[in-house]
Amino acid sequence: MAFEELLDKVGGFGPFQLWNVALLALPRVLLPMHFLLPIFLTAVPAHRCALPGAPANFSHQDAWLEAHLPREPDGRFSSCLRFTHSRALPNTTLWGLGQSPGEQLEGEPSTVPCPQGWEYDHSEFSSTIATEWDLVCEQKGLNRATSTFFFAGVLVGAVAFGYLSDRFGRRRLLLVAYVSALVLGLVSAASVSYTMFAITRTLTGTALAGFTIIVMPLELEWLDVGHRTVAGVLSSTFWTGGVMLLALVGYLIRDWRWLLLAVTLPCAPGILSLWWVPESARWLLTQGRVEDAHRYLLRCARLNGRPVGEDGLSREALSKVAAAERVVRRPSYVDLFRTPRLRHISLCCMVVWFGVNFSYYGLSLDVSGLGLNVYQTQLLFGAVELPSKLLVYLSVRHAGRRLTLAGTLLGTSLSLGFRLLVSSEMKSWSTALAVLGKGFSEAAFTTAYLFTSELYPTVLRQTGMGLTALVGRLGGSLAPLAALLDGVWLSLPKLAYGGIALLAACTALLLPETKQAQLPETIQDVERKSAPSSLQEEEMPMKQVQD
């Protein structure tokens, strides 16, 4: 008897599974709020060199700035430089206000970086880490690097949580992730220096990686084949809710410390909710924990209204399933490359996940230059994800996972490519293409999560998810730094995001299709297929169920 047959007895989709999805909704909402938080935490408002002694009369401000600040080629006052000596401006009324007339210098006046710090426009943000620690001009790289540090932490956490949850269980490691994220988030909000903030945010990313690695498999491993797609897409809408909620919370809370607290404190009720979250019965059986699996399966049958008693779900039957699925030795990342088909799957998934994350976060963190303020842009980027979910739901059921993933990545690449052809004056077209690209990239992200969870066997599912998430977060950590390439050529970041998305689209076509296939439970289930193109062709040992 395979686990799918046990699941058929107790109900593969019902109140038990819906309750499980609801309990695991909170981490799906919190993830985008933390991952996209740099949009607000690192925002750089308009700024200029601090000029002590500026006239109180606002009507003379322009003349005062003209005397002290150079202009950029576009005519704006410089944000990073001031004249070494104030210029003498003829016909100015500043002299009559008791201000020094400055010096009349021959040639081009010399400039210096702001020696007395900066003054910031606080009309949009009362405080960000950029204004708190002057992470502008020569220090702007440190401001961008905070996102890289965070995703580097997620990268490390993906490895750790993927491996440890396969060894010690999904539920236990989810508790570790919740507690760690809560404590580290609170410490981050209390940071007294940039160094302290960078370290604690990196560690917070490590903790939050547990959410990304554990939640989706913990949902899917309780679902039958026929409902995996709808449940996967449904649960991914919680991510979209988090994206839109972040726009609202960011609009209401303009101080970075309080904003960080607002997105961290919900971890507390999440910890309490774990009391009702069931451990994966699939995983329990692979570990030989028959009694625990029996208890959860009976609970599932009771909530789903299935008349399964002790005789209908005997411990002897479970012991046979456990004996067939028990892991002889602990899984390791080497196992993902030990056999031909798993090696093929792992290498392709690594490329795909790098491209998905690199393009998604490159698009998501670029909220400037669209003719909208940061809150409107964030809300619009969140709203477009809803129709993206519908696109995924319809496409994966008819076209399959592989073509859907490749198509959405191609759409992301084309949207970025067309933006390169649109001039900066065409704000409406630029906004439309940015929103379209964001929608395609979100659809690719949703499909990648569902697809990857179905490709790996139960005994290595968390390990495989951890590896691909590791490489994906590497892409996410490089995306903010790629934005610095605009100093070389303004269009270079978009070209990089689009090019990598195109490479990922081509690689996705090399993956096996999982539409209509039951979840593989052992490495042998994966390797038994000799054809590299599909998990649903001949010699499939697992029962096929119409999606």
UniProtKB/Swiss-Prot annotation:
Q: Does the keyword Kinase apply?
A: no
**Superkingdom classification of source:** Eukaryota
Which Gene Ontology MF annotations are present?
Answer: alpha-ketoglutarate transmembrane transporter activity; organic anion transmembrane transporter activity; prostaglandin transmembrane transporter activity; sodium-independent organic anion transmembrane transporter activity; transmembrane transporter activity
Q: What is its main location?
A: membrane
Q: Which residues cross the membrane?
A: 21-41, 145-165, 173-193, 203-223, 233-253, 258-278, 345-365, 374-396, 403-423, 431-451, 465-485, 492-512
Pfam families from the UniProt entry: MFS_1
Among PROSITE patterns, the record links this protein to: MFS (PS50850)
A Gene Ontology BP annotation from the UniProt entry: alpha-ketoglutarate transport
Any GO CC annotation of this UniProt entry: basolateral plasma membrane
Q: Does the record bear Metal-binding in its keywords?
A: no
Q: Where is this region: Disordered?
A: 521-547
Q: For this protein, what reaction is catalysed? A: orotate(out) + L-glutamate(in) = orotate(in) + L-glutamate(out); 3',5'-cyclic GMP(in) = 3',5'-cyclic GMP(out); GMP(in) = GMP(out); 2'-deoxyguanosine(in) = 2'-deoxyguanosine(out)
For membrane topology, the record states: Multi-pass membrane protein
Cellular compartments annotated: Basolateral cell membrane; Apical cell membrane; Cell membrane
Task: Give the keywords, sorted.
Answer: Cell membrane, Ion transport, Membrane, Transmembrane, Transmembrane helix, Transport
Please explain the role this protein plays, according to its UniProt record.
Functions as a Na(+)-independent bidirectional multispecific transporter. Contributes to the renal and hepatic elimination of endogenous organic compounds from the systemic circulation into the urine and bile, respectively. Capable of transporting a wide range of purine and pyrimidine nucleobases, nucleosides and nucleotides, with cGMP, 2'deoxyguanosine and GMP being the preferred substrates.
Q: Which family does it belong to?
A: Belongs to the major facilitator (TC 2.A.1) superfamily. Organic cation transporter (TC 2.A.1.19) family.
PANTHER family linked to this entry: SOLUTE CARRIER FAMILY 22 MEMBER
Q: What is this protein called?
A: Solute carrier family 22 member 7
